[in-house]
């Protein structure tokens, strides 16, 4: 799926509202995913996945930081996420089915906190962007 010029604009503009809040929004999205979809917890058996935990904040910051990097390199997301794609496929072996689940929860959190900015066209653009990111992250799976 290709992002149109309008999609790229919508994503960049929306991401400006996320800057400075990556850690909190990422932690909330992860908490929602782990709570509503317990099977996604399997990759973190010894971690504290409770709401507000330092692990959720740390990992949420990493997740949203990677997405911020993808936004900053929106014209070449493949290159921007190449190393992360390798890591998820070869080292972590994360089930590719989990990426859309996390994307959904990121959109939910964005809808809660950015409702004035997440209009229907923007929502569609961000959804497409997260789908592209998920595709890139699973492109190295065999």
UniProtKB/Swiss-Prot annotation:
Q: Which family does it belong to?
A: Belongs to the globin family.
Instruction: Write down what this protein is called.
Output: Hemoglobin subunit alpha
Q: What does this protein do?
A: Involved in oxygen transport from the lung to the various peripheral tissues.
Can you tell me which residues bind O2?
A: 59
PROSITE patterns in the record: GLOBIN
What residues does the Globin domain cover?
Answer: 2-142
Is-annotated flag, keyword Metal-binding? Answer: yes
| GO BP term (any one) | hydrogen peroxide catabolic process
Q: Name one Pfam family in it.
A: Globin
